[in-house]
Amino acid sequence: MAIKLEDKKAIVAEVNEAAKVALSAVVADARGVTVSAMTGLRKEAREAGVYVRVVRNTLLKRAVEGTEYSILNDAFKGPTLIAFSNEHPGAAARLFKEFAKGQDKFEIKAAAFDGNFIAANQIDVLATLPTRDEAIARLMSVIQGATSKLARTLAAVRDQKEAAAA
């Protein structure tokens, strides 16, 4: 089925806009995945703030040209499903990783984050990034732990001086 030139330009523009505002991108091969499973993936992606699209490789190469995701060009072989994370850098990687557990034929090809190429076997690095709320919670627990340790140390010094004075 041939796509009209205007439609191709619209697809390239849409994907390019998604790439410009995205925090990370993940590329996968969805060959052999059922339509109902793909529909479920798209629904989960919308809920997670992830833009998912199946695009022809030539159009995809044009769409990411001039963005930090042009490093993914070598991964654009065969049927390509691309996902851009808009709210959290690890959202698309986490979504695809979870989806791949239930789908034998779903294969993650590569990812890109902050201008760096991430191979499929290293996707866990991106998928395990903490969300903003998780990172803040971790930081607060570290700060709270250090503060309470300082308070206990000061109390011990005070008690020691009081015992020495008595």
Swiss-Prot record:
Top-rank taxon, per record: Bacteria
CC annotations in GO: large ribosomal subunit
GO molecular function: large ribosomal subunit rRNA binding; structural constituent of ribosome
Keywords: Ribonucleoprotein, Ribosomal protein, RNA-binding, rRNA-binding
Keyword Membrane: no
Annotated InterPro entries: Ribosomal_uL10, Ribosomal_uL10-like_sf, Ribosomal_uL10_bac, Ribosomal_uL10_bac_type, Ribosomal_uL10_CS_bac
GO term, biological process aspect, one: translation
Keyword Iron: no
Subunit structure and binding partners: Part of the ribosomal stalk of the 50S ribosomal subunit. The N-terminus interacts with L11 and the large rRNA to form the base of the stalk. The C-terminus forms an elongated spine to which L12 dimers bind in a sequential fashion forming a multimeric L10(L12)X complex.
Protein family (similarity comment): Belongs to the universal ribosomal protein uL10 family.
Protein role: Forms part of the ribosomal stalk, playing a central role in the interaction of the ribosome with GTP-bound translation factors.
UniProt-listed NCBIfam families: PRK00099.1-1
Protein name: Large ribosomal subunit protein uL10
Source lineage: Bacteria, Pseudomonadati, Pseudomonadota, Gammaproteobacteria, Pseudomonadales
